[in-house]
């Protein structure tokens, strides 16, 4: 009897999915990947992987993906999702991230040979704690508090995570959840937000930095932690896969040390960056272009990014490597891919396909002169408002001080210098004649 286990993987052509594929193959596992029809990114999936065409939002198209030979078993890692830095609600986003997860859950329940599901959520789905408090796993995600789960993407992941946990408790679904933080490292063929940001820094195209911090993990560590959850993750439990925080300045310094990337000299305070981003978003509404940066991007630097990932360390054997090691390996990958030559960036650009939704780096793609002018205009406008407010405030203080001084002077003259029946002005005139 054939008792082979199939590893079913959605999102196999994405950044995390590709690395999961490679690690499963290295372990001698049989991997089947779900890929959108006409998705050009299929070329990045290792050739040993069995590719099945299907669409998360089309339940019927998922049946061949779930059907394995008689006598075989399967497990599924549901990694696919639509990612966006746009904080606003999107029907497509909800259809893919929530509706697609619902379809996966239904298929797992209808296929008893599918022994377990690992749902790849996000740390963004977990309600944020105040600064100074490490964020830990929770078991309730809805209703979402928009002040603690910010942005449509995070809210869609929170909704889908709750759906998985409800299916565990109500329908007997055998599943657990992993919450990756930001992703960093080699093999990002779609050039996602983080890799795009690194390329912009290396190119010298980031006009200025921002204060604040990220929480980024090496994609290979995330892949290993996700795979470990298949056999070690407890049913109905959630596991944070995160790292220590790193500032944008620290990241820039590491890139400078690794490949002589141009150093950024000015880092915007976050409150000023938020005002500028809001102005750029309004400008983008008029022009129809992507804003240079968004308030949501600024929020991700300003928010509490400290996570407690000890549960994953203790139960899954999850480990993290240093940022320096990851940066070194990613730069070497960029050189091997022809994205940079060790001293600068080449003209080659990776394809971005429908199957790998990406919106560029932390600062979106832009014309450098136009970008500098846009930021300069916003900075000047913001400082002008601050200056106007300061001048107005100083005038009010000055007027108040002068008025108070005059009252004090009059009281002094009246009490110590004036003769009986003499006014303050008469006293001043008399004294001035002496």
Language model feature labels by segment:
Residues 5-27:
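N-terminal Rossmann NAD(P)H-binding glycine-rich loop of SDR-like oxidoreductase domains
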Residues 40, 49-99, 103, 107:
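NAD(P)H-binding glycine-rich loop region in Rossmannoid oxidoreductase-like domains
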Residues 85, 123-134, 183-187, 192:
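Conserved catalytic-site region of short-chain dehydrogenase/reductase
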Residues 91, 99-151:
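Conserved Rossmann-fold NAD(P)-dependent oxidoreductase catalytic core, especially the SDR/UDP-sugar
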Residues 148-176:
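Active-site Tyr-X1-5-Lys
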Residues 171-177, 181-214:
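NAD(P)-dependent short-chain dehydrogenase/reductase
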Residues 193, 210-230, 236-237:
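Substrate-positioning beta->alpha
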Residues 225-293, 309, 314, 324-355:
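Mid/C-terminal beta-alpha module of Rossmann-like enzyme folds, strongest
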